[in-house]
């Protein structure tokens, strides 16, 4: 019995050291406009523009801002009034085709966001200078509006490190 307790104690220490029991704690701020709201990392910058038929929100990492958009991570959120001209299925297919033709790894899935099932396309690859790049498009319709969330990271930014920051926004994104 003592042998099992020692083994369990060692396993518990290994799990605690490896971080398997801790979660990432990212400090956030709240943002709300045009019936959408979300949390975002408190070190990031948010700007928005509201027009008659659309709302654009940009959420940018400090690295993106300080490099004049040559390195870092950014999210562009676009809300459009639904019309017959909006054809996201064609846009999705074009994005996947372009990613695959340029040798990038593209995935096409769905995700639950803002209480609906949304299209979720992501890709990883290299830019023209050999830096890792990451892009993601989440789009959905709700309340007669079309929502597009366009994530991008590149220029040598640490893509794996930024994904939890993007996840904070995705998990908290809400539409009235």
Predicted regions and their residues:
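Conserved polar/disulfide-associated segments of primarily extracytoplasmic proteins
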Residues: 50-149
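N-terminal targeting sequences that direct proteins away from the cytosol to non-cytosolic compartments
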Residues: 5-66, 109-110, 127-129, 143, ...
């Amino acid at each position: 019995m003592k042998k099992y307790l020692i083994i369990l104690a060692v396993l518990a220490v290994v799990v605690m050291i490896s971080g398997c029991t801790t979660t990432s704690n990212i400090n956030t701020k709240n943002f709300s406009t045009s019936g959408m709201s979300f949390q975002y990392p408190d070190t990031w910058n948010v700007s928005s523009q509201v027009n008659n038929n659309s709302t654009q929100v940009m959420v940018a990492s400090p690295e993106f801002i300080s490099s004049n958009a040559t390195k870092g991570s950014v999210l562009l959120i676009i809300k459009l009034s639904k019309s017959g001209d909006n054809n996201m299925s064609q846009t999705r297919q074009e994005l996947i085709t372009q990613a695959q033709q340029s040798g990038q790894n593209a995935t096409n899935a769905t995700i639950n966001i803002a209480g609906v099932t949304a299209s979720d396309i992501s890709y990883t690859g290299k830019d023209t200078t050999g830096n890792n790049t990451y892009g993601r498009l989440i789009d959905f319709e709700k309340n007669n509006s079309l929502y597009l969330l366009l994530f991008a990271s590149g220029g040598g930014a640490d893509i794996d490190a930024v994904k939890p920051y993007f996840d904070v926004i995705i998990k908290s994104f809400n539409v009235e």
